[in-house]
Every structure is written in C-alpha cells, then in structure tokens.
Design a protein with these regions (language model features):
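Hydrophobic alpha-helical segments, chiefly the membrane-spanning helices
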Residues: 287-289
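Alpha-helical substrate-binding/gating segment
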Residues: 187-188, 210-228, 236-265
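SDR active-site strand-loop-helix element
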Residues: 8, 80-83, 122-127, 180-185
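Catalytic helix-loop patch of NAD(P)-dependent Rossmann-fold dehydrogenases
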Residues: 94-101, 105-112, 121, 130-184, ...
Length: 289
C-alpha cells in the first residue's frame, strides 16, 4: 500500500518539485496551499510530468479547524513535508508580525494535530539563515556550526520553529522530525513544466534574471558591491532544485524508519561558492544563447 504524504506549500517552487519526486518514488501526495504566492496551474505541470494529479486542498494553515479537516478527509497521511511559509526577507522586516503569525502558527497547528491523527514524522523546511554570516575560514558550514542572531524576522521564524519542534519532541510527543537547512535553490524541472513562478516581484536571483532577460522587468539590480570577494558581490551556495527535492524524499523515507533518531538536522547544499554577479551574468548569457 502506498504511503500518503502531506506537502504544505506544494504548489510553490520547492514544494512542486518535491511533489514530483515523491510521486515518482511511489508515494501518494496531498497538497495543501493557500495560493498566496503560487498558482493552481502548477498542478497541471505536475500531472504532465508524472501522469498523476495530486490531491489538492486550498487551506490557510493558520486556520486550525480547516487544517484538521484535511487530516479527517485523508486519514492515511503518514508524514508531512512542511514548506508553507512567507519567505521574503525584506518584507519580513516591514511586516514582522505577519511573518511570525504565518510561519509559526501554521507549524504549531500541524504539530498539535500529528499525534491525534497518528502522523509519524515531519520534514521541516529550514534555512542556512540560522547560521548567520559565518566567517570565510568557517566555510563550508557544518550542522554543528553555532547559530547566530537572525538578521531578519524571516530568519528568526526558522530558528524559532526549529526550537519548537525540538521542544515538542523532547516533551515526549510521539512524532519524529528531520530538519533540512538548505542554501539557495535554483533551476527548474528539465521538462520545463514547473519552475520558480512567484506571484509578484521575485525574491530570488534566477527568476529575476530570467524576467529581466524576457523584458518583463526593466533591469536587474544587485545590491552590494564591496564584499571581500572576486567580484565584490556576496557569495551563495546554489543547489539545483531537483536535487533538493530528492533530498526531501530521502529525508521522508528516513523519518518514517522506526530505527532513526527522534530529531535530526542536515544541511543541503553543494559546498561550492558562487558569486552573485558572476552567476547572474552566466545565467543571462545562457538565456541569450
């Protein structure tokens, strides 16, 4: 019998690619998304790639009753991959309470419902932001690296949510978790049926570059040119989104394994440095060619 996985934020960039990989690995998928930063048409792309249209429920996870109704409708859910969150760093500085409400309340609702509906494990989408700005001599960052004070409310919600999960499990809750701290996902599925298609202004480099190259945006502005790097711009560790999606599938298989630890942490990246200006130039050159 196929295992059923709930993917929150499943019509988003990483969520949609993870849904594809889950279905191709033999899982049933139920997507929950409020469509605040994604499009329902993403389901069409997933179906074209896999031949399977995942179950979909448009739900705001802050609404506990609506969230519980999902578990009642799909009682065979065994695991959760939790992507759903507000994620624009700049906006989080302008609207901190919105970010604390969206990102923290939704997780608490899921955690409270998991034991009631015998959901075994949750994969939490965390971020390298918990490490702050490590010094060059401390790169690449390991899971044992000390956490630093978050530079934005968005980053702070990731740190807080990690602690909430740990505290809940350590209190004796009958669930398990794997926290994935990943770096900078880029790219799109090779079929080109799904990719990074945010509503409004993109928050990440690659969709901004592609929209500028297509004439949707007038220009690309890169902030910061005095970093101690070869091109003066900040460094990033870019990871291909399909590889990241496969990491989530592996994590789900692991968290459902009875022999693993109650909570584990893994960084997901390449360990390879990229410079923002050079990456933008390379992407644009490939588009033009």
């Amino acid at each position: 019998m196929k295992q059923t996985i709930l993917v929150t934020g499943g019509t988003g960039f990483i969520g949609s690619h993870t849904t594809v990989e889950l279905q191709q690995a033999g899982y049933n998928v139920v997507i929950v998304d409020d469509l605040s930063n994604s499009k329902i048409e993403v389901l069409d792309g997933i179906e074209k790639i896999t031949g399977i249209r995942p179950a979909f429920e448009q739900v705001d996870l802050r609404d506990k009753a609506a969230t519980e109704a999902v578990f009642q409708k799909y009682p065979d859910i065994e695991g959760i991959i939790h992507f759903a969150a507000s994620k624009a760093v700049g906006e989080s500085v302008q609207k901190p309470l919105l970010y604390y409400r969206n990102n923290i309340v939704s997780l608490i609702n899921l955690l409270e419902l998991m034991p009631k509906y015998q959901v075994k494990g949750i994969i939490f989408s965390s971020s390298c932001t918990v490490y702050g700005q490590p010094k060059p001599e401390n790169l690449p960052v390991t899971e044992e690296a000390p956490h630093q004070k978050a530079t934005s409310p968005y980053g702070n919600t990731k740190e807080i949510n990690e602690q909430i999960i740990a505290d809940y499990i350590h209190s004796g809750a009958a669930i398990k978790s794997i926290v994935l701290r990943y770096f900078n996902p880029i790219g799109a599925h090779p079929s080109a049926e799904i990719g990074e298609l945010p509503n409004g202004v993109p928050n990440n480099l690659i969709p901004y570059v592609t929209q500028t190259a297509m004439g949707i945006r007038k220009e690309l502005t890169i902030f910061g040119n005095d970093y101690d790097t070869p091109d003066g711009t900040c460094i990033r560790d870019y990871i291909y989104v399909v590889d990241l999606a496969k990491a989530h599938v592996a994590a789900m298989a692991r968290v459902l394994d009875k022999e693993t630890e109650p909570i584990e942490y893994f960084n997901i990246g390449t360990g390879t440095v990229s410079y923002t200006h050079l990456r933008a130039h390379a992407t644009r050159s490939n588009l033009v060619c």
